[in-house]
């Protein structure tokens, strides 16, 4: 892990977020490229809503830098984001006005990559992956969601629920 003290902001109160960048390295025993799973608490939206580009945002530039420096393939996972946690954009208003947010997005990705590349506290783990799964029911109280289920847009099993405002609940799961 690495602490990233200077790259995030939370635009909603309360301002609470994790500054920890976590890296899991999968090292194949056949000599193929390592695969890094990076987990960091930030939405991938540094291009902002005013842009017209289709982009992978800063994770694209992070992945490129890591590929060049370590020849590792990267999967980025958005970490624990309870509010509106995004990356800090220096001179954001100027960059928006000058349509230069892409420059900032590249720099953000490269800087986060440098943090990932600096991680030196690796711990070897046994190659076992476990997961926990729990099913639960959610009241279908959203009329748009209920309609989408009723006409087949969303494939979901409905379960009768006398206490639900729509008369049914949906089964979902947390993994």
Enumerate the language-model features and the residues they cover.
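Non-catalytic substrate/cofactor recognition surfaces at enzyme active-site rims
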Residues: 1-175
């Amino acid at each position: 892990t690495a602490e990233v003290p200077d790259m995030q902001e939370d635009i909603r109160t309360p301002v609470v977020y994790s500054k920890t960048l976590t890296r899991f390295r999968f090292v194949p025993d056949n000599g193929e490229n390592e695969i890094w799973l990076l987990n960091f608490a930030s939405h991938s939206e540094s291009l902002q809503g005013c842009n017209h580009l289709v982009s992978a945002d800063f994770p694209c530039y992070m992945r490129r830098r890591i590929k060049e420096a370590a020849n590792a393939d990267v999967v980025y996972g958005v970490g624990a984001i309870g509010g509106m946690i995004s990356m800090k954009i220096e001179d954001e208003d100027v960059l928006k006005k000058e349509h230069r947010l892409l420059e900032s997005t590249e720099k953000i990705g490269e800087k986060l990559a440098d943090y990932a590349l600096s991680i030196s506290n690796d711990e070897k783990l046994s190659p076992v992956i476990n997961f926990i799964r729990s099913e639960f029911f959610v009241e279908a109280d959203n009329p748009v969601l209920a309609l989408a289920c009723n006409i087949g847009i969303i494939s979901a099993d409905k379960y009768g629920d006398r206490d639900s405002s729509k008369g049914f609940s949906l089964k979902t799961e947390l993994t």
